[in-house]
């Protein structure tokens, strides 16, 4: 007799990570349920989704969101809760409120604090002797206005999908930002100032079992899309990067998914780490390369001790067609560019030659044609609205600074 599949609840359904996790889980024979503040979220349109539960946005109302999730877990007899975005941080803060029998893989809140904030991450990397660009944390206008080479990057303490990141190329841009930061009291939480370096952006994704690395994947951004995201990805293999990720996860005794961005310095080849995402990130390139991050996370969540997965195949080129359309529309706001991009994606020509679709896999999950059609129609009607799609999605799943303060209050009152 085949054992029953666990009942899985994903923490949101609007992000690209959620959409891809749904595909990977579905192809493995699972059916999932979603929590979403958006009734027509991207994840809804899948043959692998059984139900979408309405809940407040975790960023706008973390208390209401948590209450809704706990009610869903109880009434739907959920076995596993998979945090596919920043809700992992929320659940870590609310750990004592989660049912004892619920399967969920979470590191301690103290470990999250070391990677959730960009300033804390920089301190962690320095302590572990992990390469990073020349970095400093500034907490005053005077420090920010000090002399330093241009260009450089400024990063807010918290941000997702490349929000809260500014590239400063000269004194005029620096002074404009300085005025804004003083007005918004941004120096109170510390701002990360980081030197710009030349090189390819690569991302590494991992799953840990109480500090033991069990799955790791790396890919290179071949083509950048809206908000600094990816349109094209190329899988790569790097033993030194895997060793660095393993060292960080071991030091934090990490449990669950953990991802990093780094720049491979063009001059030295050194991987300089620049950002962390304490969660599962877009797992389809890994899956198509032979690394099952989502499956590993599910096993760990169920309390199993999975074997260590080998590196995947290098050279697997994947595309996010939906992001390619938004990218084409945002550049010059022209319908002809959108139509040309549709043709290139459909025929796998131009920059899409040799790629496999990872975000909207029409052949395996035909339901995704509905949101894809909506986006295409809207972009052909008004190409200048491309940015709104990403902004709406990010607002549905990201944590605001106010929400983060609320989560910390939960911790302090526990």
Regions found by a protein language model. Give the residues of each.
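Active-site nucleotide/adenylate-binding loops and adjacent lid/helix of ATP-dependent enzymes
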Residues: 112-192, 198-199, 210-212, 238-243, ...
């Amino acid at each position: 007799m085949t054992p029953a599949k666990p009942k899985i609840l994903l923490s949101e359904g609007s992000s690209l990570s959620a959409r891809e996790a749904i595909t990977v889980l579905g192809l493995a024979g699972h059916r999932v349920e979603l929590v979403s503040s958006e009734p027509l979220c991207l994840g809804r349109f899948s043959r692998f989704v059984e139900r979408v539960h309405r809940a407040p946005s975790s960023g706008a109302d973390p208390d209401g969101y948590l209450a809704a999730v706990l009610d869903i877990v109880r009434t739907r007899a959920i076995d596993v809760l998979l945090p596919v975005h920043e809700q992992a941080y929320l659940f870590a803060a609310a750990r004592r409120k989660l049912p004892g029998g619920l399967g969920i893989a979470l590191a301690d809140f103290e470990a999250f604090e070391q990677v959730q904030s960009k300033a804390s991450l920089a301190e962690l990397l320095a302590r572990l002797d992990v390469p990073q660009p020349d970095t400093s944390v500034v907490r005053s206008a005077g420090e920010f206005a000090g002399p330093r080479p241009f260009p450089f990057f400024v990063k807010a303490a918290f941000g997702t999908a490349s929000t809260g990141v500014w590239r400063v190329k000269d004194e005029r841009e620096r002074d404009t930002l300085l005025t804004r930061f003083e007005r918004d009291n941004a120096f109170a939480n510390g701002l990360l100032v980081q030197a710009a370096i030349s090189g390819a952006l690569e991302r590494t994704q991992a799953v840990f079992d109480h500090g033991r690395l069990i799955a790791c994947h790396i890919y290179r951004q071949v083509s950048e899309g809206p908000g600094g995201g990816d349109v094209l990805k190329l899988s790569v293999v790097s033993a030194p990067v895997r060793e660095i990720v393993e060292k960080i996860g071991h030091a934090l005794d990490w449990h669950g998914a953990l991802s990093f961005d780094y720049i491979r310095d063009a001059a030295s080849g050194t991987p300089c780490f620049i950002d962390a995402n304490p969660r599962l990130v877009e797992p389809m390139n890994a899956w198509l390369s032979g690394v099952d991050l989502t499956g590993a996370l599910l096993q760990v969540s169920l309390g199993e001790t999975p074997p260590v997965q080998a590196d995947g195949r290098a050279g697997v080129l994947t595309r996010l067609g939906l992001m390619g359309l938004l990218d084409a529309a945002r550049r010059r706001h022209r319908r002809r560019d959108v139509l040309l991009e549709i043709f290139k994606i459909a025929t796998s020509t131009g920059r899409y030659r040799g790629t496999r679709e990872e975000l909207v896999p029409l052949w395996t999950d035909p339901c995704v044609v509905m949101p894809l059609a909506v986006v295409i129609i809207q972009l052909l009607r008004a190409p200048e609205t491309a940015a709104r799609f990403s902004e709406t999605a990010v607002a549905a799943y990201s944590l605001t600074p106010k929400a983060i303060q609320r989560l910390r209050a939960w911790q302090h009152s526990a």
